[in-house]
From Swiss-Prot:
Entry similarity comment: Belongs to the avfA family.
Species annotation: Aspergillus terreus
UniProt xrefs under Pfam families: NAD_binding_10 (PF13460)
Entry protein name: Reductase pytE
Pathway linked to the protein: Secondary metabolite biosynthesis
Gene name for this UniProt entry: pytE
Record field: transmembrane: none
Length: 263
């Protein structure tokens, strides 16, 4: 593996979009760490995506735990090695499970999961910085369309469903995004992050990963001029993040922006 490749810490790695970024990163030789509640499940999912056992052993450190706990977040940022420096990049695709027991008021199993995890990531970086590291990781986080306060980024026909069924997760994502932007607006010396990209995919679907679709079909916009569409597959979200954000890192044209992606 080339030493020039950045190290990457993954949160929410068993989720469809995140693992679809982790798998190609491992195959390409990036050294990665991933936090997983059930490490064996993550390994199985990676093998299903064609990642060899030897590649997993060589390039991936799995930290057992949950991202709502600060200590395993720290361990993941340190690539699973207490004496090592922090990861260069962070990819976070944390999300909650939608609960429909009350159809009039859908919620999440943890209504503040996204903001809690990003808050933990920022806290962990600052605490690790106190131990002597000067590194400021670059954060790539998965959010959603339907929450922009600048311009409408979803079809009008989908607005009623989004504002009813997804109100709770959207409120959570808004706070998550605000935490990231607030950090970027601090004085440079006080920032936890060395930059960010917020990815806002349209409604996520379970596409066929074996077909390896052409990423050129994905339309891309920014908050001021969003790409408006109905759906995009989790698989293509992860692949797009790897090709256009992980590979370019801090040099990405989307650094410091909220990016919409859709078909």
């Amino acid at each position: 593996m080339s030493s020039s490749k950045p190290t990457i810490a993954f949160f929410g790695a068993t989720g469809g979009s995140t693992i679809s970024c982790l798998a190609p990163a491992l195959k390409a030789g990036y050294r990665c760490a991933a936090l997983a509640r059930t490490p064996s499940r993550l390994r199985d999912l990676l093998v299903q995506r064609g990642v060899s056992e030897s590649t997993i052993a060589d390039n991936l450190t799995i930290v057992s735990g949950t991202a709502t706990d600060l200590q395993p977040v720290k361990q993941t940022l340190q690539m699973g090695r207490p004496a090592s420096d922090m990861a260069d990049l962070i990819v976070s695709g944390i999300g909650g499970k939608l609960i429909m027991s009350n159809p009039l008021s859908p919620t999440l199993d943890n209504p503040t999961i996204c903001q809690d995890v990003v808050r933990n990531i920022l806290t962990a970086i600052r605490e690790l910085r106190d131990t002597g590291t000067t590194k400021a990781p670059f954060l790539i986080t998965l959010s959603t369309t339907g929450i922009s306060e600048v311009k409408r980024d979803l079809p009008i026909a989908m607005m009623p469903m989004y504002h009813w069924m997804l109100k709770v997760p959207h409120d959570d994502k808004k706070v998550m995004e605000r935490l990231i932007v607030d950090d970027a607006e601090r004085d440079p010396a006080a920032r936890a992050l060395g930059g960010y990209v917020i990815v806002r995919p349209s409604l996520l679907t379970d596409g066929d990963r074996d077909k390896g679709g052409d990423l050129k079909k994905i339309r891309v916009g920014v908050e001021e001029a969003p790409a408006v569409g109905y759906t995009i597959s989790r698989e293509d979200v992860g692949r797009w993040v790897f090709e256009h954000l992980v590979k370019k890192g801090r040099e990405s044209e989307y650094a410091g922006k909220a990016v919409t992606i859709t078909y």
